[in-house]
Every structure is written in structure tokens, then in C-alpha cells.
């Protein structure tokens, strides 16, 4: 009779984000140390109160088994065969494009590899990327830990960009192309503020105060926004080298090719370019950015409280849109934001509508009009 396999020795550390303490466990000391370092490097300190959490994230192999069975093939990078058990603590490594393409086409460049894990409460996590030394390393873990923390706090996740001005956050929500990222970038780069988020942000109530939180998600910037951020014609020379293919539309030299493109930058990279970034701050207002009519000046107005929820509801988003789920089980159903979470925030902050034309109207003028409306 063969001896039983020894039980894995779990190691522990604590990820700290302001007052929040998030325990992390793994049976690999290098993974544990690297994860802690990546999390710390990706997230600047919050600028406001953040509730503490005690739920641990444990690296586990259950999702690895499920994907191996679904693929009917061995998992690259491991010894795990399809449709069989795996050793305790084994990590799954699969090309991320194979995982994401089952849900939707992906235009942006993603890291080549992701390691999946399962927390004790059943939450799935992508725990690392292919290059632990690259600028993308840790962003998935950081984002997911923050999102998990916010879900427990009853946060609403919004399709919104955000900036911090005078110690308070303003979230610019709206459909794609409405200029929300441009407004947030101008507030940070030109008006002495901090960049919070470019496409998705959380809002929740802590101790009676509405809070806005960025989700540690890199932002895609267009040429016009980047020029306004860096303030000169040759802004391309300031961008980090695309060692992880973070630029879309580059030629063989790594420089930006002619034509439309987006550049993907994290908040940490923005800070390296001289644009100050924040993780969280008390929320002052939520602004719905919308296209203004041609030939008319930009307009900012306050929304009556009774109309605010219906106006903001279309901008609610799921916290998770990356990991695979079972047939008929959507990320929105598991992790979607609720009207109750949003209503709790809107009871405490005003909602404004800013109608303007990106590329024609002055972003600084729109932001100053928002400030005037709130004063």
C-alpha cells in the first residue's frame, strides 16, 4: 500500500490596501512573494476610507480541472491530464486568448498566459500573467481583489471614468465615445487633479459617505487624449516601450504607426509619465457625459433626484467579464451590480448631465462648469 501524498503546506501573507487587509495563501513561497510585490506596485494608496476585509484568497486547482476537462486535452505548462484529478495546489496556465475568445473577440493585446485559482468562497481568480517582471504583471490580481472587496461592500460597478479634484472624486459615466476618459484625463493633467479610472469604476457607501474607487484596470487612450496628457507634439517618445505589446497600432520599430490607434496604460504608468493617479476618494458627483447637438455650446445641468436612477442604470456593469462560466451562467448574473447598490450611492451625491462634443468643445470648460454646478 503506497503512502498517502503529503498535504500541501500553505504559506500566508497579507496584501494591504490602505486599512484593508486581504490575506493571501499559496503553497509556493515565490508565488506568494511575487503576488504581494505585484499588488503593492500596481495600486497607489487610497485617498479616503476603505473598509477592512478578512476573507483569504487561496491558490487552488479546481478551475484547472474544469478547464482541462472542457478542453479534453492536457493543460500547457502543467503535468495535469484532461479529465483527471490534479495535485493539490497545482496552477493552471493557458493562453489567455483561448479562454477569452469563447466569450467575445478581443482587439486589445492581453498578456500571453494567465494562472487561474479558486477562493474558498467560490470566487474565481486569474492570479498572474506571463511575465512577472513586465509592467502588466499583477494588474489582473489587483483588479480582482479590489472588485471582490467592493462586492462585499455592496458597490455598484459603473462604465465610468473618474478624477479626483480638491480631494473629492467625480465619475464621468456614459456610452463609448462620449469623452468620459478625456474629461478625467484633463482633470488630472491640466487642472491639478488625480486620475482615478478610465473606463470602469466602483461606487459604494462607507460609514455614510459615498466613495469612488478605481478598479486597477489599464485605460486605452486615443491620440488626442495622450497629446493633452503629455502636452507636446512628440508625446510618443515619452511612452514606455511596448515590451508586452501594450500599444495597438505599432510598427516593427515599436513606435506608433500612422492612423487610428489606442495606447494601453495603467495608472502606475501614467504616474511615471507625470500624471498623478489615485485609487479612491469620497465621491462628490456622478456626471453622465452625452453628445451635444452641433452648433450649440456645451451644457451642464443637475438631474432631479427622482430621475437619477433611471438615467444612470444603463451604465451599470458586471465586475467580471474575463473568466469563463458554465453554460447559461453569465458573469452579469453572478456579479452584476444592483439597483439597490446604486440607489444607496445616489441618495448621497447629485447626478449631472454634461452635453458636449469631444474634439470641438474645451474639456476644461466642461469640468469647470461641473465644479460651478457643485459649488
Where are the model-predicted features located?
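A noncatalytic interaction/capping subdomain that flanks phosphate/NTP-handling catalytic cores
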Residues: 1-171, 176, 189-196, 201-375
Amino acid at each position: 500500500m503506497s503512502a498517502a501524498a503529503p498535504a500541501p503546506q500553505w504559506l500566508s501573507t497579507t496584501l494591504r490596501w490602505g486599512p484593508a487587509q486581504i490575506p493571501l495563501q499559496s503553497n509556493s513561497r515565490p508565488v506568494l512573494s511575487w503576488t504581494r510585490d505585484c499588488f503593492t506596485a500596481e495600486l497607489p494608496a487610497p485617498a479616503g476610507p476603505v473598509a477592512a476585509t478578512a476573507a483569504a484568497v487561496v491558490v487552488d486547482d479546481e478551475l484547472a480541472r474544469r478547464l482541462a476537462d472542457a478542453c479534453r486535452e492536457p493543460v500547457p505548462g502543467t503535468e495535469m491530464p484532461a479529465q483527471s484529478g490534479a495535485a493539490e495546489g497545482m496552477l493552471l496556465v493557458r493562453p489567455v486568448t483561448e479562454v477569452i475568445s469563447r466569450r467575445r473577440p478581443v482587439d486589445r493585446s492581453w498578456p500571453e498566459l494567465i494562472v487561474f485559482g479558486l477562493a474558498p468562497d467560490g470566487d474565481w481568480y486569474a492570479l498572474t500573467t506571463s511575465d512577472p517582471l513586465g509592467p502588466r504583471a499583477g494588474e489582473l490580481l489587483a483588479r480582482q481583489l479590489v472588485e471582490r472587496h467592493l462586492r462585499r461592500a455592496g458597490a455598484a460597478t459603473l462604465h465610468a471614468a473618474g478624477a479626483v479634484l480638491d480631494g473629492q472624486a467625480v465619475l464621468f459615466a456614459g456610452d463609448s465615445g462620449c469623452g468620459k476618459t478625456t474629461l478625467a484625463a484633463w482633470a488630472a493633467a491640466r487642472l491639478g487633479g488625480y486620475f482615478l479610472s478610465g473606463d470602469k469604476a466602483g461606487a459604494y457607501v462607507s460609514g455614510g459617505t459615498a466613495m469612488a474607487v478605481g478598479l486597477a484596470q489599464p485605460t486605452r487612450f486615443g491620440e488626442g487624449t495622450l497629446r493633452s496628457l503629455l502636452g507636446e507634439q512628440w508625446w510618443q517618445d515619452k511612452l514606455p516601450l511596448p515590451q508586452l505589446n501594450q500599444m495597438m497600432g505599432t510598427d516593427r520599430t515599436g513606435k506608433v504607426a500612422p492612423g487610428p490607434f489606442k495606447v494601453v496604460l495603467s495608472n502606475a504608468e501614467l504616474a511615471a509619465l507625470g500624471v498623478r493617479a489615485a485609487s479612491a476618494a469620497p465621491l462628490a458627483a456622478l456626471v453622465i457625459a452625452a453628445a451635444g447637438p452641433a452648433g450649440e455650446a456645451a451644457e451642464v445641468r443637475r438631474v432631479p433626484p427622482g430621475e437619477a436612477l433611471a438615467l444612470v442604470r444603463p451604465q451599470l456593469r458586471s465586475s467580471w467579464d474575463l473568466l469563463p462560466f458554465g453554460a447559461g451562467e453569465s458573469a452579469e448574473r453572478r456579479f452584476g451590480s444592483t439597483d439597490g447598490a446604486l440607489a444607496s450611492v445616489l441618495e448621497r451625491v447629485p447626478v449631472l448631465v454634461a452635453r458636449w462634443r469631444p474634439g470641438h468643445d474645451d474639456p476644461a470648460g466642461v469640468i469647470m462648469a461641473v465644479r460651478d454646478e457643485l459649488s
